[in-house]
Amino acid sequence: MLTGPDGQQNQVFLTPQELQQWQARQQQQQQQPGQQAPGGAPRPPPAQVQPNLAPVEGVLDTEAKGPNAFLRQIRRNLLPGPEDAEIPKNLVQKLRLRQGQYLTAMAQMRGQKGLVQKVDTVDGQPVEGAPRLPHFNDLTSIDPVERIKLEHGHREMVTRVLDLIAPLGKGQRALIVSPPKAGKTIMLQRIAQAVLANHPEIHVMVLLIDERPEEVTDMRRSIKAEVLASSSDRATGDHLKVAELALERARRMVESGKDVMILLDSITRLARAFNKEVDSSGRTLTGGVDSRALERPKRIFGAARATEEAGSLTIVGTALIDTGSRMDEVIFEEFKGTGNSEITLDRLLAEKRIFPAINIPQSGTRKEEKLFTQKEYEKVKKLRQMLFSVKPVEAMEALVKRLSRYTYNDEFLDEL
């Protein structure tokens, strides 16, 4: 504490380096009488203003090189930016922080950038006294048993049909298999809108990889969810950074007990990006796909699960087929069967402007009986048997026509 000219005591904030510099100046001043304070005493160190602290927040990225980690901004799609606050990695280790956690903190500002001095909250919880959370990979995976209701309007046929043909549960790993221009993006939008309307407890994230910039804009304007995108005008490395940090963010939320849904468009383009960036293993599959290129995309898609001890992660991803690319076919074949729900879109249905363009015989959810009541399951089973006997185009036309007569799916099933 120092006594100022007004007689008040002021607290001084000096770094060790600044203190050494001040002490060196005092030694020089003691040798120069003209530099001494009245009475011959050394002049006190100048009062230091308290550091310029400001609140900062963001998603923790510990993978950056150097002594500091960074707080990435959602509005910048989790990509590096000039205003990202830095946080010393020794502080990260001290607080046992994990990649992808959302932090609020106080930082000493240096222009636009800040250096975190104190962490206040981690994923919405006070950092002091916060319970130790389990690690995602240590959680027990179970079959989805809690249904995600998508039906949310008489005229929303996409979600009403999905509820009957390929229902989703919390922790589902669903693959939308789609040829070009079959309506996969519209389907993702409808799913997002339904979940936001019916399940406010689910945190919805939309992850767009290598999409056209105008598609990104349309998605952001269509749904009020967290949209993270690396559009087609970005570097391939950006696609990987966004996808992997978004996954880590979702995993941390699940560890803290939250239910999360990621809508990923598309797995095919994500796999292409990894194929381009991965170090060559020396072994190339058909279509020019490196044998190691699909490991990380599979890890991302395979993260979807329901857990016993914590929350759930639902992933609905799209896979492209009939693009004329042998690589895309190989990617689809590698992912086929890795999910526990599959929705196949039909080009012929789309060309006839029949939406949703779902191929009913090729679509469905494994162990769907766990998502329906016994009565519902018997009715849905009967419906599938009826529709299976006709061609896909006729089946979807008939289903949409019948559904339009009823306000709710339950009313429709009761009449079967």
Label the predicted regions.
Residues 109-176:
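P-loop NTP-binding catalytic core
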Residues 80-89, 152-158:
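Short, structured beta-strand/loop micro-motifs enriched in basic residues and often containing a Trp
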Residues 1-82, 98-101, 106:
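Acidic low-complexity intrinsically disordered regions
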Residues 70-74, 86, 118, 220:
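Short, acidic/hydrophobic/Gly-rich beta-strand patch recurrent on exposed beta strands
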Residues 174, 183, 192-195, 200-416:
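P-loop NTPase catalytic core
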Residues 91, 107-112, 180-181:
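Short, charged beta-turn/beta-strand-edge "cap" motif at the junction between a beta-strand
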Residues 89-96, 165, 177:
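Short, surface-exposed secondary-structure edge patches
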